Swiss-Prot record:
Protein task: Sulfotransferase that utilizes 3'-phospho-5'-adenylyl sulfate (PAPS) as sulfonate donor.
Active site, per annotation: H121
Leader sequence segment: none
Record bears the keyword Transferase: yes
Top EC class of this enzyme: transferase
Top-level taxon of origin: Eukaryota
Gene3D superfamilies linked to this entry: P-loop containing nucleotide triphosphate hydrolases
Protein name as annotated: Cytosolic sulfotransferase 3
Location, primary (coarse class): cytoplasm
GO molecular function, one term: sulfotransferase activity
Binding annotation for 3'-phosphoadenylyl sulfate: K71, S72, G73, T74, L75, W76, R143, S151, Y209, R275, K276, G277
Protein EC: 2.8.2.-
Encoding gene per record: SOT3
Keywords, comma-separated and alphabetical: Cytoplasm, Transferase
Length: 314
């Protein structure tokens, strides 16, 4: 769904400009205007993309949509999904070097043939306008709020050719805490998909970044079963899971030439999407006070929901 979001402010229609004038508006951490639409905040050009998507996307029953809040493991989940379906297309793997993940970035592997793979950062209620009653499947990946924030900070700094600018981090932190940030508030975003996964367990799968890190085999099998392409006992015995996990590991993906030199449709260099990918790295960048404040906010926002859920998820 990247093509729907790859717009400029000059692409705004008169209808969208009129809509924006009626919406709540705030300044983002980089000084760009944000407006609130259907409960979430968007840059004006992103809102145009959302509107275009809601009106123009034609879902197919076999579509797979990978969803996440930005910098929560989207690329990793995309790679795993591509690898799962690729093994069903080419089970023999006669030429492992011909695998599409070795010559393309996961963000660029959006097949036009069935099953089609898409990705989005919009919350579920906004996505649902486009998919309506389609049985297409949605896989959501959730990451610790603090790690996600730090990861977004790094890619913003890299995109601006700045080295770990603390001023930007502090601005992003304040924006996160207020909820006024692109695709935010964070807590509403994850709750939209979590609720959907409870209401539609056969259509929406809620996955957690931390759990994929601690139990990669179990989570990969869970993903494969949800997508309708479970591993056979023979595949498990011959190490198919290990092969996929190794190929889709961040160290392996980041070492590929295409991910060192290529660019995404919006001009961001693929290499900027890769960093450590570890759990708990926020401790190296956020102060203990910042971490405590985010934890306090998340507990407050999730107080009406299962304590077990947010302890495991966040």
């Amino acid at each position: 769904m990247e093509k729907w979001m790859n717009l400029r402010d000059e692409d705004l229609t008169e209808e969208t400009k009129t809509l924006i004038s009626s919406l709540s508006s705030e300044k983002g951490y980089l000084g760009r205007n944000l407006c609130k639409y259907q409960g979430s905040w968007y840059y004006y050009n992103f809102l145009q993309g959302v509107l275009n998507f809601q009106r123009g996307f034609k879902p197919q029953d076999t579509d797979i949509i990978v969803a996440s809040y930005p910098k929560s493991g989207t690329l990793w989940l995309k790679a795993l999904t591509v690898a799962l379906f690729e093994r069903t297309k080419n089970p023999s793997h006669d030429d492992p070097m011909s695998h599409p993940l070795l010559s393309n970035n996961p963000h660029n592997l959006l097949s036009s043939s069935s099953p089609r793979l898409f990705s989005t950062h919009t919350p579920f209620h906004t996505l649902q306008v486009a998919v309506k009653d389609s049985p297409c499947k949605v896989v959501y990946i959730c990451r610790d709020a603090k790690d996600s924030l730090v990861s977004r900070w790094h890619i913003v700094c890299r995109s601006l050719n700045k080295e770990e600018d603390r001023t930007i981090l502090e601005s992003m932190f304040e924006s996160f805490c207020s909820g006024v940030c692109l695709f935010g508030p964070f807590w509403d975003h994850i709750l939209s998909y979590w609720k959907a996964s409870l209401e539609k367990p056969k259509q929406v799968l809620f996955m957690r970044y931390d759990e994929i890190k601690t139990d990669p085999h179990g989570q990969l099998k869970k993903l494969a079963e949800f997508l309708g392409c479970p591993f056979s006992k023979e595949e498990e015995k011959n190490g198919s899971l290990n092969k996929i996990l190794e190929m889709c590991s961040l160290p392996n993906l980041s070492s590929l030439e295409v991910n060192k030199t290529g660019k995404s449709i919006n001009g961001i260099e693929y290499k900027n999407h890769f960093r450590k990918g570890i759990v708990g790295d926020w401790k190296n960048h956020l102060t203990p006070e910042m971490g405590s404040k985010i934890d306090m906010i998340m507990k407050e926002k999730l107080k009406d929901y299962s304590e077990v859920w947010f302890e495991n998820a966040l």
